[in-house]
Swiss-Prot record:
Belongs to the scaffold protein DUF35 family. This is DUF35 domain-containing scaffold protein. It comes from the Archaea. Interacts with acetoacetyl-CoA thiolase and HMG-CoA synthase (HMGCS) that catalyzes the first and second step in the mevalonate pathway, respectively. The gene is acaC.
Length: 136
């Protein structure tokens, strides 16, 4: 099994993982994750931008042979989610059965356990997406 991410590095990325903090360049291009240079226009003037956490499933698959450390979760759905604001995020889907997943399904970001390291007890949390349940 690979070594866990250093705790200090994990905490540096805390806001991105829990609140979907990305970037917005001076020309209005939205980026996730935040980058030092806008890949669209080359601007270096990037400010923080908080995404709503809502979006739609573009496409998805079921991971049946996961990477080391994620065997406990198999099989699990992995999706490309287009956020309301435009950027596309690759993330696990949660709180949904595979037969219920549809392209265009509205989802929202939630914080969930991503991985647990038995050797030192470190638990990593991050974002996943779940279906938005519409009340009638």
């Amino acid at each position: 099994m690979g070594k866990p991410m250093q705790v200090s590095r994990y905490w540096r990325h805390f806001r991105e993982k829990y609140r979907l903090i990305g970037g917005k360049c001076e020309n209005g291009h939205l980026l996730f994750p935040k980058r030092p240079i806008c890949p669209i226009c080359g601007s270096r003037n990037i400010e923080e931008f908080q995404f709503s956490g809502k979006g739609k499933v573009i496409t998805w698959t079921i991971v049946r042979n996961p990477p080391s450390g994620f065997e406990y979760y198999k099989p699990y759905p992995l999706a490309l989610v287009q956020l309301e604001e435009g950027p596309v995020v690759l993330a696990q889907l949660t709180d949904v059965e595979p037969e219920e997943i549809k392209e265009g399904m509205e989802v929202e970001m939630v914080t969930r356990k991503i991985r647990e390291f038995d050797e030192d007890g470190l638990i990593l949390y991050g974002y996943k997406f779940r279906p938005i349940i519409k009340s009638e």
